[in-house]
């Protein structure tokens, strides 16, 4: 017999502030309770404008560096996956996010501050229920030597492998079930990671201005710049965090065995679209990157 899952929102509003990883500016993010069936909705404040951008697959507009949603024009909110990983872990289905920048703050580079913030606000269980996504046949997406598979399972679990051209990141893998407790202790604290040469190249273009050892694991050609890691395999754990956050865009709890190799945001969202197409029987609108710059000169100056 399938366990009934109730929709959830937060009990009280909570404000989180942090640095935008690209702008280097302080970003304010406010989370508010919402009625059942509201879903997850961002309100982007730009001057006197208040722009509504729902969290849904049809609103994903770019996956090149992070997962970005938009309203169909130039308005968008990027780097939503760390927040959504925490939201999904705690079972939040209905919440309003007010934000004063085009990017969710990077915080410490993980989902932990969002998880702690939501827990501090309290969680309210709603009367309404929500049906989890389950599949009866394998679903997969492939891009060259990269792939992402979802197999039928009564629980959520993952087997993830990464293989970068780096002595510390060759063949790093991790397998685990993903219940709330395991996600909270073993996955959500894992920080984003990057290579020093890539960070320097981005900063030369006026991007990644908020990136630092305070919010990322940074790798040199032969080691880590950071004094210590939270886990020996923190990098692959963070990729699992990203995957959970990206699939949370589906807007429903999900179950299955996820098997990933060298995947990323684009494959994550492609799999989510395949899953929802099978579950609903409807073909979802294909997202199209408008190739909007991460920041315009005007936004970067704010």
UniProtKB/Swiss-Prot annotation:
Catalytic site positions: 265 (proton donor)
Reactions mediated catalytically: a UDP-3-O-[(3R)-3-hydroxyacyl]-N-acetyl-alpha-D-glucosamine + H2O = a UDP-3-O-[(3R)-3-hydroxyacyl]-alpha-D-glucosamine + acetate
One Gene Ontology term of the molecular function aspect: UDP-3-O-acyl-N-acetylglucosamine deacetylase activity
EC number of this enzyme: 3.5.1.108
Keyword Ribonucleoprotein included in the entry's annotation: no
Keyword set, alphabetical order: Hydrolase, Lipid A biosynthesis, Lipid biosynthesis, Lipid metabolism, Metal-binding, Zinc
Highest taxon of the lineage: Bacteria
Coiled coil: none
Listed cofactors: Zn(2+)
GO cellular component annotations of the record: membrane
Protein's pathway: Glycolipid biosynthesis; lipid IV(A) biosynthesis; lipid IV(A) from (3R)-3-hydroxytetradecanoyl-[acyl-carrier-protein] and UDP-N-acetyl-alpha-D-glucosamine: step 2/6
Keyword Membrane belongs to the record: no
Residues at which Zn(2+) binds: 82, 238, 242
GO terms, biological process: lipid A biosynthetic process
InterPro entries the record matches: Ribosomal_Su5_D2-typ_SF, UDP-acyl_GlcNac_deAcase, UDP-acyl_GlcNac_deAcase_C, UDP-acyl_N-AcGlcN_deAcase_N
Recorded family membership: Belongs to the LpxC family.
Classification via PANTHER family: UDP-3-O-ACYL-N-ACETYLGLUCOSAMINE DEACETYLASE 1, MITOCHONDRIAL-RELATED (PTHR33694:SF1)
Described function: Catalyzes the hydrolysis of UDP-3-O-myristoyl-N-acetylglucosamine to form UDP-3-O-myristoylglucosamine and acetate, the committed step in lipid A biosynthesis.
Protein's name according to its UniProt entry: UDP-3-O-acyl-N-acetylglucosamine deacetylase
Organism name: Leptospira biflexa serovar Patoc (strain Patoc 1 / ATCC 23582 / Paris)
Lineage of the species this protein comes from: Bacteria, Pseudomonadati, Spirochaetota, Spirochaetia, Leptospirales
């Amino acid at each position: 017999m399938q366990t009934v899952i109730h929709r959830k929102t937060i009990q009280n509003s909570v404000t989180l502030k942090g640095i935008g990883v690209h702008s280097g500016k302080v970003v304010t993010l406010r989370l508010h309770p919402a009625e059942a069936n509201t879903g997850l909705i961002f309100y982007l404040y730009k001057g006197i404008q208040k722009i509504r951008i729902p969290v849904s697959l049809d609103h994903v507009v770019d996956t090149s560096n992070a997962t970005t949603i938009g309203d169909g024009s130039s308005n968008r909110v990027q780097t939503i996956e760390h927040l959504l990983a925490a939201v999904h872990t705690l079972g939040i289905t209905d919440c309003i996010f007010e934000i004063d920048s085009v990017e969710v703050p990077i915080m410490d580079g993980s989902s932990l501050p969002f998880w702690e913030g939501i827990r501090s606000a309290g969680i309210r269980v709603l009367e309404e229920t929500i049906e989890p996504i389950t599949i009866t046949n394998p679903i997969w997406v492939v891009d060259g030597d990269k792939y992402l598979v979802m197999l039928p399972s009564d629980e959520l679990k993952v087997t993830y492998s990464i293989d970068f051209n780096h002595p510390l990141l060759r063949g790093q893998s991790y397998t685990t079930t993903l219940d709330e407790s395991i996600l909270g202790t073993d996955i959500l604290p894992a920080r984003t990671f990057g290579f020093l040469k890539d960070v320097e190249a981005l900063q030369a273009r006026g991007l990644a201005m908020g990136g630092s050892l305070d919010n990322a694991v940074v790798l040199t050609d032969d080691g880590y710049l950071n004094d210590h890691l939270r886990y020996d395999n923190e990098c692959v754990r963070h990729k699992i965090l990203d995957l959970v956050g990206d699939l949370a865009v589906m807007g429903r709890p999900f179950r299955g065995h996820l098997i990933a190799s060298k995947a990323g945001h684009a494959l994550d969202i492609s799999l989510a679209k395949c899953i929802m197409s099978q579950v609903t029987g409807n073909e979802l609108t294909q997202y199209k990157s408008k190739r909007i710059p991460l920041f315009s000169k005007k936004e970067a100056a704010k």
